């Protein structure tokens, strides 16, 4: 079995797969290293043969997690590293090491699945878009605040905006103009995300016409499904690229 980890700024997404055929044994999202070890340890018949990690954390934080994983499960984690070129994709950043590893691996995974030009829209803490040409050239992308950041900024800097997560969820049953603060904030943020997605689609069409594949990934991908009905929703797109960057079989 292989433990795969996607370590973001706020959460760790994890899954355990069979080494032979990549069948998913279990998975989840946690908010701390300790919670990760506890959750993975509850899997029945757990026998890890390896671990691979993609991380946007600092080197020190990533190293600490690798040590913890090694102590808990007796495996040596492999951490994905930036590359100028891999699996037919050429990193488009002027300094290739500065491209976030989550974006790089999502680009690898998307190009592998699309076998041609593709647009990746990743909606998590940040909203990100990346363009990969039919020849594998990464053309660059965009980053802006995602739903969690927009929401937290409004809550933090506007004293009268206070509501809980349950209220936020109820507010998203419609996108009609809000008749309460929670509805106005939540629906406004969703419309901004949808506008972001539509703009990326326009950009992609200006580059490739209709000859491209759209991928939606990240926890808030369902919120923009309406804006990109032709998109393929691939929640584990980063893990597709991670397996390519860190083969363990």
From Swiss-Prot:
Cofactor stoichiometry and binding remark: A monovalent cation. Ammonium or potassium.
Role, per record: Catalyzes the phosphorylation of pantothenate (Pan), the first step in CoA biosynthesis.
GO molecular function annotations of the record: ATP binding; metal ion binding; pantothenate kinase activity
Pathway entry: Cofactor biosynthesis; coenzyme A biosynthesis; CoA from (R)-pantothenate: step 1/5
Domain of life per record: Bacteria
Record: residues binding substrate: 93, 100-103, 181
Record EC number: 2.7.1.33
Family: Belongs to the type III pantothenate kinase family.
Cellular localization per UniProt: Cytoplasm
Disulfide bonds: none
Keywords, sorted A to Z: ATP-binding, Coenzyme A biosynthesis, Cytoplasm, Kinase, Metal-binding, Nucleotide-binding, Potassium, Transferase
UniProt name for this protein: Type III pantothenate kinase
Active site positions, chain numbering: 102 (proton acceptor)
Catalysed reaction equations from the record: (R)-pantothenate + ATP = (R)-4'-phosphopantothenate + ADP + H(+)
HAMAP family: Pantothen_kinase_3 (MF_01274)
Cellular component GO terms, alphabetical: cytoplasm
Keyword Kinase on entry: yes
Subunit structure: Homodimer.
Residues engaged in binding ATP: 6-13, 125
Pfam families on file: Pan_kinase
Keyword Transferase part of the UniProt annotation: yes
